[in-house]
Amino acid sequence: MPAKEVISTVRALKAIKCKGIVCYSAGFKEIGKTGKYLEDRLIKECGDTPLIGPNCYGFINFSDNLALWPFSHKGDRCKKGIALITQSGMLSSDIIMATRSLPISFMVSAGNQAVTKIEDLIFYFSKKTNVSCIAIHIEGISDLTRFLAVSYTHLRA
């Protein structure tokens, strides 16, 4: 859906007690000042509701065979595997479509990380018993202190 319609959609989802949202739509801070304004409104509208994105492909949970992903993908169900986190939708798609024998438990395309940050995902996956390791591809870190703290904690787990 167009970025300008996302805010009202989030409001409607929250009204029906939606527990989390994936926002595929682009047209937010990645396009400049107007998009940044929309993204700030999106953050405010979400409040404490988790949101992956905007400007992302979403996530795939191979362990439970669940996907909020915009198109078909490859990958086998596995009991334990890698959690892959990337900001890039295209890279996540390329990885998922490659024919490999690598056991993947989760793939997350985090996009702009308006609400749910890469650090949140690292923390979440570090607690999952079906994750053997976490692999990340990042284009930038907005909170280096938090990133290092969460990463160090995961390394010790």
Predicted regions located by residue number:
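Catalytic-core regions of core metabolic enzymes
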Residues: 1-156
